[in-house]
Amino acid sequence: MYSFMGGGLFCAWVGTILLVVAMATDHWMQYRLSGSFAHQGLWRYCLGNKCYLQTDSIAYWNATRAFMILSALCAISGIIMGIMAFAHQPTFSRISRPFSAGIMFFSSTLFVVLALAIYTGVTVSFLGRRFGDWRFSWSYILGWVAVLMTFFAGIFYMCAYRVHECRRLSTPR
């Protein structure tokens, strides 16, 4: 059980760090505009060496940002539950902490996938046509790696829960 929780906690830390870095950086998309390179993130866009805030209140930007923030909150809550799973205190005895951590990481995964799907759909269908020479960049790729890490954190915590339940049910009363 502890090895599953340790693996889950490792994946959780890495996934959450990648998620926060992806959300905070400005390299989701790179393109060429008027002969110079430009790049953009969720919060800013940069032309040359000068960056500007994204002040447009466009629905897909707001949805992508909201889902990324929800994902980060779920991942942080999952880490807290995952750390609490190592303690054997009788508080919250009706709620399994590894199970709760697993649910939080699956929720985080769902929110990241929704954010990346919205961003991908809009970028390919609208922005891709607007800018001829463009590509997704490293911040966006970190988001997809965070999907894998939070998903595997959820898997590890669900395995830890299953092992714990099997042991609990097999011990005589």
Swiss-Prot record:
> Where are the bilayer-spanning segments?
4-24, 67-87, 99-119, 141-161
Q: Does the keyword Membrane apply?
A: yes
GO MF term set: structural constituent of eye lens
Which tissues does it occur in? Eye lens specific.
InterPro entries, A to Z? LMIP (IPR003935), PMP-22/EMP/MP20-like (IPR050579), PMP22/EMP/MP20/Claudin (IPR004031), PMP22_EMP_MP20 (IPR004032)
Modified positions (Phosphoserine) are: S170
Q: Which residues lie on this side of the membrane: Extracellular?
A: 25-66, 120-140
GO terms for biological process, alphabetical: cell-cell junction assembly; lens development in camera-type eye
Location relative to the cell = Membrane
Question: Can you tell me which residues are glycosylated?
Answer: W43, W61, N62
At the top level of its lineage, which domain of life is listed?
A: Eukaryota
What is the topology of this protein in the membrane according to its UniProt annotation?
Multi-pass membrane protein
Residues bearing the modification Phosphothreonine: T171
Q: Which residues point to the Cytoplasmic side?
A: 1-3, 88-98, 162-173
Gene Ontology cellular-component annotations: cell junction; plasma membrane; vesicle
What UniProt keywords apply to this chain's record, in alphabetical order? Cataract, Disease variant, Disulfide bond, Eye lens protein, Glycoprotein, Membrane, Phosphoprotein, Transmembrane, Transmembrane helix
User: Does Cell membrane appear among the keywords?
Assistant: no
Name the family: Belongs to the PMP-22/EMP/MP20 family.
In the UniProt entry, the disease listed is: Cataract, multiple types 19: An opacification of the crystalline lens of the eye that frequently results in visual impairment or blindness. Opacities vary in morphology, are often confined to a portion of the lens, and may be static or progressive. In general, the more posteriorly located and dense an opacity, the greater the impact on visual function.
How is the quaternary structure described? Seems to be associated with itself or another lens membrane component via disulfide bonds.
Q: What does this protein do?
A: Present in the thicker 16-17 nm junctions of mammalian lens fiber cells, where it may contribute to cell junctional organization. Acts as a receptor for calmodulin. May play an important role in both lens development and cataractogenesis.
The protein's name: Lens fiber membrane intrinsic protein
Q: Which gene encodes it?
A: LIM2
